[in-house]
Amino acid sequence: MIFQFKHLNEVPMYTHTWAQNDRLALANGFVRNDLNFFKPQNYILNHQFPKNWSDPSYSTITAVEFPIHDYVPAVFMKAFGTNEPWIFHAYILLYSIIGFFFLYLLAEKICGSKVKAALVVLFAIASPIYTFYQGGFLPTIPSIANTVIALYCYALYFEGKGEKWFRWALFFFTFAALARFTFVIPYLAVLGFELIRIFRKKAKFWPNVIGVGVSFLVLFAAQFYTSRLRAKYGSDFLSELLPADNFEEMKNILTRMWDVMLYAYLSAKHYFLIFLVIILALISILIKERNTYKAFLGWWFICLFWLTGACLFWFAMTKQFYAHDYYFLDTFYLPIVLFVALCLAILPKPQWYYGEAIMALFVAYFGIVSFKETSNFQKERRVFVANDHFTGSVINFEGSDEFLTKSGVSSEDTILVIHTYGPNIPFIQMNRVGFAVEGHDTGDIDRGLSWKWDYVVFQRPYFMDDVYAIYPDILQKVESIAVNENLILCKRKTDTIPQTLMDFMNIKKTYAIVKTNFETTDSLNYIAVENDPTSANNRIGWIGENDVYGFSHGFRKEIGSDLRGRVLKVKGKFLRRNDGQISIVIAYSKGDDLAYYQTIDLSSISKLNEWTEKEFIIFLPPRQSKEYLLSFYIHNPNKNTVLLDDFEFAFYRN
């Protein structure tokens, strides 16, 4: 609750913005279709599957796995008369809390100790990646909770409390797997153990076979219905296996998971605790001082089957693990939690004086230090960097519904968005349906322009790189009719009157210009200067092999005293001597506090030993305070030699 409260009404941003916005779009779709559960829809008229957004279906209905955890928030949205995301956040968060309550009950049964059970819950809840998604939008969190509830019901059945608890376990296992089919793995693990018990004549087959049969019939029926929707309407949700193409790719993915995601899955304190309980459990077994409570031993079979199934799923979906950290929650998270509980169950109850109190202090200490690491992880995850265009799109489209309405765009008009970062992201904010075009090549953009739409919207900060650089003829196809700080609203161009790029983007007259031609005195402060070998009357700037940072500028006066965003146009010539990477860096900083950072690669847009003249338009975000300095420099980490000439920095108000 502490981590989630201040983000309770936040639209999905930062990590997996795309996936989480897709879930919010489903909830909004149910609100729009009067809560028709069997026709889930979002905002997209050209779906990702099967034709990769290239086919306009003109229907927003999309196939998706049993979207009950998108539907329930929609019911409350409809009842409260609002689509604000806090309803979705609160639903997922409350579901997770219920799951942890049952995890405590389950762990207490397995471990036979309230203190050990509390440690298991703290271990689970303090996972950095779990905490990030705990109040989010993914169905993984409710499915984790339902699986834990199912395991607790199974534990009651296992203790001999009656057949009804097995049926409740079937219900919650089915409910978990319906929303996220990956959770069929723990279901199968439990059924596998039940088969062993049946063969050993410790459980009966016939009393439960009907319940299991009905459960799988429901699961297969749901999958069949989803496949029919997919065949008829298409889908924006993955439904195929994505194994690694070869052993080398698998090894690279494992390396990335180790290097990048290891401490996202669990903190260093988690790994230490796992190591500690394994060592203590082994010692307890060797000296025969282990817990004499035997009922938990059957859980080791379930844990083994579960981990085996998770590993098999990893091989089947290796590429998704590379790009989607929440797949860890779908697979390995709960069996690891169960493994820790089982190791703790082996440990005997402390016989020394105040033993339970000392254990409770250790549990409290673990909770404090692990939550501190998790808190730092949450802060790092929630930082906006300029190359995160998914979060940038959320920011750019904020308030777009009102902007479009004031510009005369009806709520029934169809919108085209070219080069979307997460197809549903702009349409959620615009509250309108439309076409999402990837826009990676001219054919893709031409195709989108040929469809039936009323208006097209571009993101101003990304227009130059994402649209104009790929398709400069766009100025002949559409004309700008309204512009705000982040968006350009256009309609089809019906005349042949030319329009300039600056007019199209509504970038007006400059208010400050800084020129560096390496001839005047003020040009000599930033860089070494030498005579141009090709022209006796010209001097050029020079960045040597040992200059990691060169041509540095700090702009404070030029960006003005107010905190609003600015547009910076950088124009200049450069020549590079070798293949070492060079790039432009633009940043807002105050001491060591970095608020904004953007890089522009120069190596990929130039040829060796040839002068290249380029112009870049950078949309600078609002500053947090007047103390932030705008910095510009050329980054040369790989010992290149770079020549520069005739640079100009022009500032515009946004």
Residues of each region from the PLM?
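Signature aromatic-anchored transmembrane alpha helix within multi-pass, membrane-resident enzymes
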Residues: 171, 212-217, 343-378
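Hydrophobic/aromatic-rich transmembrane helices and adjacent perimembrane loops
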Residues: 140, 185, 321-348
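Membrane-proximal, lumen/periplasm-facing interface regions of secretory-pathway glyco-
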Residues: 13-14, 325, 358-406, 421-425, ...
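Short acidic/glycine- and proline-prone juxtamembrane loop motifs at membrane-interface regions
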Residues: 132-143
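Perimembrane helix-loop-helix junctions
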Residues: 153-161, 173, 185-217, 283-293
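Transmembrane alpha-helix segments characteristic
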Residues: 119, 124, 168-173, 213-217, ...
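Short periplasmic/luminal acceptor-recognition loop of GT-C membrane glycosyltransferases, typified by
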Residues: 394, 402-442, 455-460, 490
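Membrane-lumen/periplasm interface segments of specific transmembrane helices
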Residues: 207-279, 308-315
